[in-house]
Amino acid sequence: MSAMLIHVENVPMAIAESDRDRVIGNLRELKDDVWELKSENTKRAYQYDFNQYLGFCKDNALPAMASDVNVTKTTCRAYLDYLMSTKLKHHSIRRKIASVRYFIGVSELPDPWKQSKLFAEYTNHKINQKPSRQSQAAPMRLEIIDAINAKLDTDPLIGLRDAVIFNTAIDTIFRASNLLAIEIHHIDFAKQRIFAPRSKTDKSGKGQYGYISTTTINLIDKWLTRTGIADGPLLRKLSPKQTVQDNAMQYHALLARYKNLAATLNLEFKPSCHSTRVGGVVTMFERGISLDQIQKA
């Protein structure tokens, strides 16, 4: 297969001469005709997972693909047992196995999970021993935001920006990507809302609005007045001397502010960029807002 798809060299294979031309032809067809039709996320996942599998096979001198289903089953069982020894969750392991099966299927080589019911049951039993979900982010509830507002020193620009970040995040229930993408023209002060042009849950592509409280409006207004920002990104990078930059904050900088918040408030949990979103949802539930309305947020 093309180097575009495989980044691991000298991987053991056990493909019979009679199968080799078909396998090469199928993989070439995948590269030339099908690969670019897939979404970037799908391509990235398949490529990452399969190259990880190939690396495992190389390190353990096991044939990655074989004409003999029993050879493939031995390799795949060893790989499954390896994945089970890691900290990967249920769905991550299933995805990695699915990626291996995808390339076996493309090659039209025997799939041990299809050929052996016992191996399929073994795999399901093993994977089901793993937690099926990642632990949910600890919610930053409304009372924590109130504590933030009481404790944050908003005289320095970094403290004022923190207040804008956390209040906007819990009000709008925006994801980190939406927060970082806020521009001044997205903010409607009169109607107390912020427009997000893109959303993970917005299938229509029309964008969505997030509500902002009077407290948040006042903080944003103070931030704009102090910084002189008139257009462009709302949440800007700050230099070491707290000079406002033209560029928007990056994700790693946003995450660092959440970590700093834990130290400031002596929180017993480690907040993440998802904590304000979870906290906002919890608050909405407690205030009687319907599940349908929350799902649209």
Regions found by a protein language model. Name each.
Residues 58-61, 108:
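Short amphipathic alpha-helical interaction/hinge segments
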Residues 11-12, 60-62:
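Boundary/linker elements of alpha-helical solenoid repeat scaffolds
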Residues 2-44, 67-278, 282-297:
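Conserved catalytic core of the tyrosine transesterase superfamily
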Residues 39-57:
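Hotspots on structured nucleic-acid-binding interfaces, especially in canonical RNA/DNA-binding domains
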